């Protein structure tokens, strides 16, 4: 198992290129199961979750060829398997995304209940209810979802009681081969969903309302789609994380390959804190702030402040003047990084889903442990400004979603080493 050793308080300067969005790539990889022609997916990030999904597709019978480190060609014309086994699915929750496409194309599938990150309840009930609304029979037996629609799926209204990103994605993929019209009401509005819509539209699926909370889908009444090649959009959470690298170290950094309007909740908050940003069509440059003011954040669904940036801003709050307040409304157990930040000297108090952070705190290097993907990046941010050396353990969480993070930060001047645990 690896850990990162980080020397704190090293000056940073330069630029970072953002990788493709993991959270866009995963549903698009799953959607290739709907296609009878080969598809090339470009700008895939080389992270553990992508490799796990690729392995799952291969296990289902898809033919995979890596054309370069970030381009994958997938042929799913002759799949021979419609069972997503526990051994593969347990590695990440996003594996549930194969449910919709397998059911739509083959009218029956067996998918293990998923595993993945430990940040609270992420029930699959919303996914199952959506499949039932399209006419599927669902049974859960011995840890497996058995879904069946002998006569194929039929378009219908799907109302989500609670906004669900992966639930919306599964419903979209299933509806793309359903007969007639499906309306998804209270759909998630993330950019990653908009890109999935673009991908499905390339195969002839008619989708109205892209980017809104109500999607109208007219399915293609064939056995499969003919999807076209696609390039994954830049990762807005990775971009936000590197903006926070600049913010917490009060450095001048330029973030390349971004889509500015995907980052507005993050950039608005950084400007409120006191940073100057030069926002261009494909890049953002952050400049040191004369004074960094405390702030308040409430996490919300897109286009609100992303829950996936909450941990990074908690680390940043330790260096701001005054007391900051962060309210987490989307997930339970998502403050597990707080106790690890406290090991570095952070002054944080928690009350249910609200964290209060006292700023202007001098952090000191220590051994800390990552508890989930975004918590790991928050600990690295804090270590960059801590006095002395920090070691961040259990970084397999980090490797699930950040491509070559230590290489990218070291290119800015940081001193970060990946080492093996003894």
From Swiss-Prot:
GO terms for molecular function: UDP-N-acetylglucosamine 1-carboxyvinyltransferase activity. Phosphoenolpyruvate binds at residues 22-23. GO terms for cellular component: cytoplasm. CDD domains: UdpNAET. It is an enzyme of class 2 (transferase). Pathway: Cell wall biogenesis; peptidoglycan biosynthesis. The modification 2-(S-cysteinyl)pyruvic acid O-phosphothioketal is found at residue 117. InterPro entries: Enolpyruvate_Tfrase_dom, Enolpyruvate_Tfrase_sf, MurA_subfamily, RNA3'P_cycl/enolpyr_Trfase_a/b, UDP_GlcNAc_COvinyl_MurA. It comes from the Bacteria. UDP-N-acetyl-alpha-D-glucosamine binds at residues 93, 122-126, 308, 330. Its EC number is 2.5.1.7. It catalyses: phosphoenolpyruvate + UDP-N-acetyl-alpha-D-glucosamine = UDP-N-acetyl-3-O-(1-carboxyvinyl)-alpha-D-glucosamine + phosphate. Keywords: Cell cycle, Cell division, Cell shape, Cell wall biogenesis/degradation, Cytoplasm, Peptidoglycan synthesis, Pyruvate, Transferase. Transmembrane segments: none annotated. SUPFAM superfamilies: EPT/RTPC-like (SSF55205). One of its GO terms (biological process) is UDP-N-acetylgalactosamine biosynthetic process. The active site is at 117 (proton donor). Cell wall formation. Adds enolpyruvyl to UDP-N-acetylglucosamine. Belongs to the EPSP synthase family. MurA subfamily. This is UDP-N-acetylglucosamine 1-carboxyvinyltransferase. It comes from Helicobacter pylori (strain P12). The gene is murA.
